[in-house]
């Protein structure tokens, strides 16, 4: 039966595991009202549009 010659170092183990734990950039879409980049399924904070309809008044947010 095969046996490793030496213990795997912490750095080597973490480097191998770290490849699968990379952070992904957030998925952004253009707002239909103003063209601002927003996260999908969220109201645009700049113009207050969601799915082509204005749902909030951004002037009242300030």
Swiss-Prot record:
Pfam families: Ribosomal_L32p
Any one GO molecular function term: structural constituent of ribosome
GO cellular component: large ribosomal subunit
Disulfide partners: none
Ribosomal protein recorded as keyword: yes
InterPro entries noted in UniProt: Ribosomal_bL32, Ribosomal_bL32_bact, Ribosomal_zn-bd
Any one GO biological process: translation
Transmembrane regions listed in the UniProt entry: none
UniProt keyword annotations, A-Z: Ribonucleoprotein, Ribosomal protein
Similarity field: Belongs to the bacterial ribosomal protein bL32 family.
NCBIfam families xref list: rpmF_bact (TIGR01031)
UniProt protein name: Large ribosomal subunit protein bL32
């Amino acid at each position: 039966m095969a046996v490793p010659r030496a213990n795997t170092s912490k750095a080597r183990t973490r480097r191998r595991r770290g490849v699968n734990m990379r952070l992904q950039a957030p998925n952004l879409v253009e707002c239909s009202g103003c063209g601002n980049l927003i996260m999908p399924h969220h109201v645009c904070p700049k113009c207050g549009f969601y799915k082509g309809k204005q749902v909030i008044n951004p002037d009242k947010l300030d």
